[in-house]
A protein has these predicted regions:
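Short, compositionally biased strand/turn segments
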Residues: 64-84
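A generic structural signal for short beta-strands and their flanking turns/coil linkers
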Residues: 47, 73-75, 94
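Acidic, Ser/Thr- and proline-rich intrinsically disordered linker/docking segments
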Residues: 2-25, 31, 38-40, 62, ...
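Short, flexible segments with low predicted structural confidence
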Residues: 49, 69-70, 105-106
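Small-side-chain structural scaffolding
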Residues: 52-55, 71-73, 110
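Glycine/small-residue-rich phosphate/adenosyl-binding loop
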Residues: 44
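The phosphoinositide-binding surface of pleckstrin homology
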Residues: 47-62, 82
Length: 173
């Protein structure tokens, strides 16, 4: 049964990433199905996939071979990459580890920088048009999740945010 659930998650993630790529075709990304499969393998059954996109996990705009799939669930942010020959890379950012988000825009591509307690994650080669959507999604998600850590939020508020992120993933802003 696990294989079927993983395939469903892979399909959901892949569809969200491809919708992102269609809205922002300038984003540089390769081997998306393989990366989506790695992400799906690490999503727990009680997590809901809210948003997904692809980017290069690198500080350098010249590095175009380090594609990662970034998935936002209702509990955390996941980054996954299937290595070319064997193995994979996987990172998880929980709301309590998140510090801040920085957006940098260049002439063609931009970068989203996620600062965590342990490290700084650079997501580069993003279409400059995608930066505002990514900033909105990550900021809204993290503010809501951090608020939940500090004080209890109502189920209605949580549901409203999740619906907003789902719709943004389907249609953009």
């Amino acid at each position: 049964m696990k294989e079927g659930k993983t395939m469903d998650k892979t399909k959901i993630i892949y569809e969200k990433v491809m919708a992102f790529k269609q809205r922002f075709p300038g984003t540089v990304a390769w081997r998306l199905k393989a990366h989506c499969k790695v992400a799906a393998d690490h999503i727990n059954n009680d997590e809901e996939i809210l948003y997904a996109f692809a980017a290069q996990k690198s500080y350098s705009m010249l590095n175009i071979v380090s594609t990662f799939v970034v998935v936002i669930t209702d509990k955390r942010i996941l980054l996954a990459q299937k290595r070319f020959f064997f193995g994979y890379f996987y990172y998880s950012i929980t709301p309590d580890m998140f510090n801040d988000l920085t957006i940098k825009m260049g002439l063609i591509w931009g970068m989203a920088i996620i600062d965590t307690v342990k490290e700084t994650v650079y997501l580069s080669n993003l279409s400059s048009g995608a930066l505002q959507e990514i900033e909105t999604v990550i900021s809204k998600y993290m503010m809501q999740e951090k608020r939940q850590y500090e004080q209890e939020i109502t189920p209605e508020e949580r549901s409203k945010l999740q619906n907003e992120l789902r719709n943004m993933s389907k249609h953009g802003e």
